[in-house]
Structure formats: structure tokens, C-alpha cells
């Protein structure tokens, strides 16, 4: 039977979602071990969005196949019991069709990048936001972001380690919400290149700091090279919010 779980986690202390050969500190491995501890079955867990080290999730989605049949609330509670000392929580579990795949069945992924824009240290949010000390012009950031909407070659906004064969992606929505000194960059698309959201966030911050002409974003896009865009924002400000199916 195939089960789908929705997962929330604090990514600060993990090596990322995906299992790694020389590390036992991935989120995937922690959940697989928790499932084994209550079911006795060695399962393979597949996720909807592979987050890097330090990245958080409010609504990661994963699936696994298990022979043992359990009531859904028991699956959720049993996994959480075996994760109780770890900042990973299963929010809910459901049975899905065998054709469902957490990665390949996804129709849209939603990310949010969180910034605190003030000079005084963000004592209560360290590790959960990127603190930018210089004042940001959010209106310029919004105007620059509009040029990223739609279908583009996003080679300027992917890491040098990105292995995607095709750099063309379609950004469905990008919105920048300001509440006092908190700035959230919200972005959604069916798929993303490696580090795409973090590089976009870093680039938009540079626009906001330097009061750069928003039209300059078109030049960055046209260059199709990583060096044209801004810095890669730190991982701890990034959240995988949810995935639509």
C-alpha cells in the first residue's frame, strides 16, 4: 500500500533531505528509520522537493510503500513517536494510488524566503531568517521581480552544481510581502533549478540595497551565466511551504 505524508521540519541541524553516502544525518534517513522502528519494514521514501542543508519545510510531501496496513492516525503518531527528539514532524498521512509519486505527480511547488531588515540583531529568529542590515527598497525589489515571471532561461539563477539538462523554467507567481521589518519573497512554479530561489532572493536584496534600476533584471536574465546574478542567499531563510498535486 502506498502512503503519502506531509512533513514539517527545522532543517538547521540536518545535511539536507536526501540520504548521503558518508552521512547519517539526512531528513530522509531519519524518517525511514522511524518507519522501520514501528513497522519492521525497510522502506524507500521519496519526496516532492529535495531541500538542501539548513532549509526548512512547512509542508514537504513524501511517499512510501508499506505492506503493513495501519490506521492513518497511527502511522502519523508512530512516526512522530520515533522522531520525538528530532525537529521533524509528520502532520498527516493518507493512502494514495500506486501511480502517485511525490516528485513526479507534483503540479506546483511553493517556496518562501524570509528576511528581517533591521540593524539590531534578530535574537529570536536566528537560524530562521536572513538578516539584512542595510535598508531595502521593497518597491524596487517588487518591480525587478516582475521581470522573472513567466518562462525564461534561468541559467543566471542556478548553482554551478546544478545538473538539470534544461535551464528553462516557468515562474507562475512571485510576490514580495512586507510587514514592518519582515520581508517575505513568495515564489511558485512546477519545478526549480538548484539554488534558484536562494539566488533570486540574493539578487533581489541587491536590487533593494543598491536602488538598482529594475530593468537591469532583464540584462541579468539575458546573460545566462551565474556570475550575472547576485549572491546566493543563506539556506536558513528558505522554506518549502507546500506542494500541489
Swiss-Prot record:
EC class (word): isomerase
InterPro entries: PsdUridine_synth_cat_dom_sf, PsdUridine_synth_TruA, PsdUridine_synth_TruA_a/b_dom, PsdUridine_synth_TruA_C, TruA/RsuA/RluB/E/F_N
Gene3D superfamilies: Pseudouridine synthase I, catalytic domain, C-terminal subdomain, Pseudouridine synthase I, catalytic domain, N-terminal subdomain
GO BP terms in the entry: tRNA pseudouridine synthesis
Catalytic residues in the record: 52
EC number(s) on file: 5.4.99.12
The UniProt record lists the keyword tRNA processing: yes
Function: Formation of pseudouridine at positions 38, 39 and 40 in the anticodon stem and loop of transfer RNAs.
Entries under NCBIfam families matching the protein: hisT_truA (TIGR00071)
Family: Belongs to the tRNA pseudouridine synthase TruA family.
UniProt-recorded name of the protein: tRNA pseudouridine synthase A
Chain's gene name: truA
Amino acid at each position: 500500500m502506498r502512503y503519502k505524508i506531509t512533513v514539517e521540519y527545522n532543517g538547521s541541524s540536518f545535511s539536507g533531505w536526501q540520504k548521503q553516502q558518508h552521512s547519517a544525518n539526512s531528513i530522509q534517513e531519519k524518517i525511514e528509520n522511524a518507519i522501520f522502528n514501528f513497522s519492521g519494514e525497510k522502506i524507500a521514501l521519496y519526496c516532492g522537493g529535495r531541500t538542501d542543508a539548513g532549509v526548512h519545510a512547512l509542508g514537504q510531501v513524501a511517499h512510501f510503500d508499506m505492506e503493513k496496513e495501519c490506521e492513518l492516525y497511527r502511522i502519523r503518531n508512530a512516526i512522530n513517536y520515533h522522531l520525538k527528539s528530532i525537529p521533524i514532524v509528520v502532520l498527516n498521512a493518507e493512502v494514495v494510488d500506486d501511480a502517485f509519486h511525490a516528485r513526479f505527480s507534483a503540479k506546483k511547488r511553493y517556496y518562501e524566503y524570509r528576511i528581517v531588515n533591521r540593524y539590531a540583531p534578530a535574537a529570536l529568529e536566528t537560524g530562521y531568517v536572513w538578516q539584512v542590515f542595510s535598508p531595502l527598497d521593497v518597491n524596487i525589489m517588487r518591480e525587478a521581480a516582475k521581470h522573472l515571471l513567466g518562462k525564461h532561461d534561468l541559467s543566471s539563477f542556478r548553482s554551478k552544481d546544478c545538473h538539470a539538462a534544461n535551464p528553462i523554467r516557468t515562474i507562475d507567481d512571485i510576490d514580495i510581502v512586507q510587514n514592518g521589518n519582515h520581508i517575505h519573497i513568495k515564489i511558485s512554479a512546477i519545478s526549480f533549478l538548484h539554488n534558484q530561489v536562494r539566488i533570486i532572493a540574493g539578487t533581489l536584496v541587491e536590487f533593494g540595497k543598491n536602488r538598482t534600476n529594475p530593468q537591469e533584471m532583464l540584462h541579468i536574465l539575458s546573460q545566462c551565466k551565474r556570475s550575472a546574478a547576485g549572491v546566493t542567499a543563506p539556506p536558513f531563510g528558505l522554506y518549502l511551504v507546500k506542494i500541489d498535486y
